[in-house]
Design a protein with these regions (language model features):
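Short, surface-exposed patches at the edges or C-terminal ends of soluble domains, predominantly
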Residues: 1-174
Length: 174
């Protein structure tokens, strides 16, 4: 069976970058993504599950069989909801119109990435424009044995760490 898909957008918005292709092509062991994603999401989220699946299919296609994923609907069973929450995937509230009434429902839109005994998660997939970067960053972090170090000098009028929260948060995530 031949898999092919054409991305006719000028920016190649629906294609993996060469860096992401090389990253999964060089996986030397099984890498699993568990995508906890509610099946029937209301607008504006209703296409996100399909678009995420397409992106994960691309990763798998370039991985020589080492990249696998599971697309799981946690709302189907309470034990699956609990599993998602154990992995750090919280439920989010979404607005749904049913019977001409606006209601709030619980939904899941998160990923857990597993490699060996290590794991990372993306708690809520909010912006699919950045999902390739987020997934590839997590893959690189999980598969890399190199731990970079950073040093900050102070005392020369630089802002204190408390004042540069964004940098601190970014470093914590790394």
């Amino acid at each position: 069976r031949l898999f092919t898909r054409l991305d006719l957008t000028s920016t190649k918005a629906y294609s993996l970058s060469d860096a992401s292709k090389n990253l999964v092509k060089n996986l030397d062991d099984k890498f699993l993504v568990k995508a906890y994603f509610t099946a029937e999401l209301p607008p504006p989220y209703n296409n996100n599950r399909r678009l995420l699946k397409d992106q994960l299919d691309d990763y798998r296609a370039y991985s020589k069989g080492n990249f696998q994923y599971e697309l799981i609907d946690p709302s189907s069973k309470p034990e699956i909801e609990q599993e998602a929450q154990r992995y750090g995937i919280p439920p989010v509230q979404v607005q749904v119109v049913k019977d001409d009434k606006l209601q709030i429902e619980k939904a899941y839109m998160g990923l857990v990435l597993l490699y060996g005994d290590k794991q990372e998660h993306i708690q809520v997939v909010q912006n699919l424009d950045k999902i390739e970067y987020e997934i590839s960053s997590k893959i690189k972090k999980l598969t890399s044995n190199v731990q970079n170090k950073i040093g900050l000098l102070s005392g020369q009028g630089e802002p204190e760490m408390e004042k540069i929260k964004q940098l601190q948060q970014l470093l914590t995530e790394q």
